[in-house]
Structures are given as C-alpha cells and as structure tokens.
Amino acid sequence: STNAKSEQSAEDIIKNRKALFSKNYNTAKKVQSLSSNGDFDEAKRLMLEMSENYITLKEMFPENTKEGFKTEVTPLIWEEKEKFNSLMEKSSNDMVQLISTIEDEDDIRGTLGKLMWSNCKACHSKYRLPH
C-alpha cells in the first residue's frame, strides 16, 4: 500500500531494493544451475519468485530515494520512470515465459541468456552506477 511505503524511510527502501535485486541475481544463478541440471520444478518455482520480485521493485523507487545510503542507481530511473517500469515488467513477463518454455528448449543456456540475463544487463548498463 502507498501509505506503508511513505512511512518507510528512504534508507529502508534503498536497503530493501538493493537486497531484492541482489536476491534476484543469486536466484538467477540458481535458476541457471537447476535448469542446466534438468531440475525444472525447482527452477520454475524460483522463476516465479523472480517474476514477482520485478513487479515489487517497480514500487521501490519513490522520489525520496534518489541518493544516499549507498544507492547504486542513476537519477535516470526517475527521468525515465515509464521506461524503467516497462523494463521491470518485461523482466517479469520474460520469467513467466521461461516457466512455460524452459523444459522444451534445446539451448537452455541461450534461452536463459535471452530471457533472463539480457534483462539484467539492459537495466544495469542504463540505470546502475558503474562500479
């Protein structure tokens, strides 16, 4: 809810969104490993989790979180809010697509590259400070 978000401090929001992006990255590595080993049920469960996290992340960039508290995002997120949100939605939708197609893919690595890792890269190259 909007009220709960406004009551949350900028510091908490920044820490939480960093933790969620970090979690998605670690989950993506697990998805890669599980899918490569044919453990699709667990991989799909994690894909769904990632998909939901991307939707949550859209709400984690209020105006008061542009700087401070070791945030690693560029101000461009707020200037291009619709583009950023679209990228989060695409990332979420691509994970859902993966759930329904991953078992039938011949090239699992390539498919994960296209539908999972490319979204990480697209966002990082544009909206994350170089580090």
Show the residue positions of the predicted features:
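Sec/Tat signal peptide C-region and signal peptidase I cleavage site
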Residues: T2-Q8
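Sequence context surrounding c-type heme c attachment/ligation sites in exported
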Residues: Q8-H131
